[in-house]
Design a protein with these regions (language model features):
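Solvent-exposed loop/turn segments connecting transmembrane beta-strands
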Residues: 171-177
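Outer-membrane beta-barrel transmembrane strands
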Residues: 7-45, 49-53, 69-89, 96, ...
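Extended hydrophobic secondary-structure segments that form protein cores and membrane-embedded regions
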Residues: 96-102
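Surface-exposed loop/turn segments flanking beta-strands in extracellular/periplasmic regions
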Residues: 1-8, 53-68, 109-136
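Feature captures outer-membrane beta-barrel proteins of Gram-negative bacteria and organelles
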Residues: 180-186
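N-terminal active-site segment of His-dependent metallophosphoesterases
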Residues: 105
């Protein structure tokens, strides 16, 4: 016999995971001095994920040694945007100008560990296992930031012109090449 008994194994082994997520969005628009509007927008996402697996040392695939595995992942990300806009009508002429700033931030913390050689049967805690077979942990961060402006003009809702400029930076690139400029005219 290979020591397998599915019902008994299912009763003794444990597989567990949990996830928590919190998300939120907020914005406010404030109008002032007749033609100005300031807008503030933001969102946030927080996530935690935990996975655990326990294999008993009495019967089944982990007979004689036992097995435990734990993985923890924590994510945090947010975006913030600030805009200042000015709009004005001069007879048949309409002019709009906007300037803004936006930033994004992402962070991940990841930890994983696997151990074997269970000391006391049925205790599914890392401290109850003596030999680490796998261990990994890392942090990842990614950020972007942008500054931008746009001007629009229209005459009598017939002729239109627009120009925009944007300067964006990303943490994924080397500091010598982190920022880029983008523009359009039409």
């Amino acid at each position: 016999s290979n020591g397998r008994h599915l019902l008994w194994e299912s009763e003794k082994n444990k597989l567990w995971n949990a996830a928590n997520t919190l998300q939120g969005n907020a914005y406010v628009d404030v109008s002032f001095l007749r033609d100005f509007t300031f807008s503030l927008k933001g969102n946030i996402s927080l996530r935690n994920i935990e996975d655990s697996q326990y294999g008993n040392a009495e019967i089944g695939a982990y007979k004689d040694t036992g097995f435990i595995s734990k993985i923890d992942q924590e994510y945090k990300e947010y975006t913030l945007q600030q805009l200042l806009a000015w709009k004005h009508q001069f007879g048949r002429h309409f002019v709009e100008w906007m300037v803004g700033h936006e930033n994004y931030d992402y962070k991940l913390n990841f930890d994983a560990i696997q151990k074997k050689n269970e000391s006391f049967p049925g205790i599914d805690e890392l401290s109850n296992f003596t030999t680490t077979t796998y261990s990994e942990g890392y942090k990842d961060t990614y950020r972007t930031e942008g500054h931008f402006t746009r001007a629009r003009y229209d005459y009598n809702e017939t002729y239109f012109a627009e120009a925009s400029f944007r300067r964006d930076g990303s943490s994924i690139f080397h500091t010598d090449h982190r920022w880029g400029n983008f523009w359009s005219v039409g």
